[in-house]
UniProtKB/Swiss-Prot annotation:
Protein name: Type IV secretion system protein virB10
Organism this protein belongs to: Brucella abortus (strain 2308)
Transmembrane segments: 33-53
NCBIfam families hit by this protein: T4SS_VirB10
Membrane-topology descriptor: Single-pass membrane protein
Principal localisation: membrane
Assigned keywords, A-Z: Cell membrane, Membrane, Transmembrane, Transmembrane helix, Virulence
Length: 388
């Protein structure tokens, strides 16, 4: 270093005490301490790693030695195949068959004789189902016994079933009112199906409108007829099955009783203008679908009570006339005195004979009625559909 590069120091006097510098000495000492601590820590870590490594090697060596000792104690096994079996000696030739000797007839008869009673072989235990009700019994000497046994089995089975039902019923009753309410009615399931060929099907539940051709009189059974007033189409509404003007025939019975205002008519067959005929077997109804045909009811009141009323009136007038003639100037009339028992008996007899006259229903021709279709009607056997 030249003197030119030396900085100019401020002037000092000899013997003057200056300020000490502590920055350079302090920083160098701190660096030395940190370096020393780092070296010591690094050495300690290396020593720890060396110790752990040596301990792991020692454990592995110990485990391998132990495994070798255990495996060496197992003896070695050798397997040898068994020697093959010696060959079988050759079979000796079969002797020639002996000639068949004929059996004498007496010997054969002796063989076919049945065994003695004492030597009867014991029968095997076989399940006998002849007493079952499902077995077919032929007409023989044992018919009565088989039938009796079958009836006994059936009665026993029925008794067991009834006892089971009674026990279930008693169990429900013993459960109390709440237990009874918790058991609902058991119903069977039903399977759904599809209607076939709805183009030619008049479904059950349809109503045919019809006008009477004949007058109905329930005095005696009779026949009836009506004319269809409205076209009837198939279930899908595409094909005309019963044309307007078709004739329907039916029948009715004289079964009107006191208090009844309708008559039951069964319509049996329909005939279309094209000659198509089909059986209906469906009941008649009113235009709204009510069961039976309503009509005018004649209760025959005067026929039932007219004779008795006339006899009672004649008896009363006769008593009045008799009392008037023989009573003098008295103004009182007693209708309950005097004879006339024979006339009273006649009135009772007349009433007894006429009281049971049934009422009569009348329904005139031309009145509108309905027919409830009670079954599916299939016209596929007479009709067909052609594409346009």
């Amino acid at each position: 270093m030249t003197q030119e590069n030396i900085p100019v120091q401020p002037g000092t006097l000899d013997g003057e005490r200056g300020l000490p510098t502590v920055n350079e000495n302090g920083s160098g000492r701190t660096r030395k301490v940190l370096l020393f601590l780092f070296v010591v820590g690094f050495i300690v870590v290396l020593l720890l790693l060396l110790v752990f490594h040596m301990r792991g090697n020692a454990e592995n060596n110990h485990h391998s030695d132990k495994t070798m000792v255990q495996t060496s104690t197992v003896p070695m096994r050798t397997f040898k195949l068994p020697p093959p079996p010696p060959p079988a000696p050759p079979e000796p030739p079969a002797p020639p068959p002996a000639p068949a000797m004929p059996i004498a007839e007496p010997a054969a008869a002796a063989l076919s004789l049945p065994p003695l009673p004492d030597d009867t072989p014991a029968k095997d235990d076989v399940l006998d189902k002849s007493a079952s009700a499902l077995m077919v019994v032929t007409k023989s000497s044992g018919d009565t016994n088989a039938q009796t046994a079958g009836d006994t089995v059936v009665q026993t089975t029925n008794a067991r079933i009834q006892a089971l039902l009674d026990s279930q019923k008693n169990t429900k009753q013993d459960a109390g009112s709440l237990g009874t309410l918790l058991h609902g009615t058991q119903t069977d399931a039903r399977m759904a199906s599809l209607l076939r060929n709805r183009d030619f099907l008049l479904a059950k539940g349809s109503i045919i409108n019809c006008a009477l051709q004949t007058r109905l009189d329930s005095t005696v059974p009779g026949m009836a007829a009506c004319v269809v007033t409205r076209n009837m189409y198939s279930d899908n509404g595409k094909v005309l099955l019963i044309e307007r003007g078709s004739t329907i025939s039916g029948e009715y019975d004289a079964n009107v009783k006191q208090g009844m205002a309708r008559i039951y008519v069964l319509w049996t067959r329909v005939k279309t203008p094209n000659g198509v005929v089909i059986d209906l077997d469906s009941p008649g109804a009113d235009p709204l679908g009510g069961a039976g045909l309503p009509g005018y009811i004649d209760s025959h009141f005067w026929k039932r009570f007219g004779g008795a009323l006339m006899l009672s009136t004649i008896e009363t007038l006769g008593r009045y006339a008799t009392q008037k003639v023989g009573g003098g100037g008295s103004n009182q009339i007693n209708l309950n005195t005097g004879g006339g028992e024979s006339t009273s008996n006649l009135a009772s007899t007349a009433l007894k004979d006429t009281i049971n006259i049934p009422p009569t229903l009348y329904k005139n021709q031309g009145e509108e009625i309905g027919i409830y279709i009670a079954r599916d009607l299939d016209f596929s056997s007479v009709y067909d559909v052609k594409p346009k």
